[in-house]
Amino acid sequence: RNEMVEFFAHRIEGYEFNGPVKVWGHNTFDKPSVVSEVEYDESWLVDEYEFTASVTDKPVKVPITGPYTLANWSFNEAYEDTEALAHDLADLVNEEIEKLVEAGARYVQIDEPALATTPDDHAIVGDCLERIADGIPEDVRIGLHVCYGDYSRIYPEILEFPVDEFDLELANGDYDQLDVFKDPEFTADLALGVVDAHDADVETVPEIKENIQKGLEVVPPEQLTVSPDCGVKLLPRTVAYEKMANLVQAAREVEQELDEGEIEVERSAVTADD
């Protein structure tokens, strides 16, 4: 894949590209324009999913750039406002997930980095997620990734979203916002970022274990999964691999220590179904 909006815009009818725009410093972004009603033509990700699933015996998570980010990070030349565009895009995402489910996918993550920069639009994101989840089987796990921002402006409202898991970027800020998610109680599953996706320094296994245990301050073990803070494509491949290898080792060690009673969890367990 290339840039997270560009990849999908090339596959959605109604988008066109007119050249790059400057975003910061000398960096540019090939920002697409919506010039007509968006339409679903053919699958965006089924081939990618089927290939990935064929080379592993583990479950495969399929990330999809969310409709709000696709709308917010594009020039809108066809719709009344961002909300109307995002709603139509959400319906297309729903169609794509249906195709992925037919292909065997059971774990989908919606990436909405734009929510971190425009938190007042959380209601639009919630409406989009309702459209995305409509008719999707209950055994399909839907996660939502929101990049680093002022999480206090969207929590606890995000708990009303129809998703099973929230993937949050907290290692980047040294967990300075961890307390945001302690009150009121975090009732969904938490996918905690435990390695920094923007720093080429590779965290050690003991460091990652400490980060994982921070998640246990928010949710019990059965509600906690671990992940990198964000996508690792901007890191050198060797660095990304080392970070992920250490993450896996740290998670296994924490899981074993929990099983052996070496780590005490003081908070009461609340399941995501409650």
Provide a role label for each language-model segment.
Residues 1-274:
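Domain-level signal for soluble alpha/beta catalytic cores
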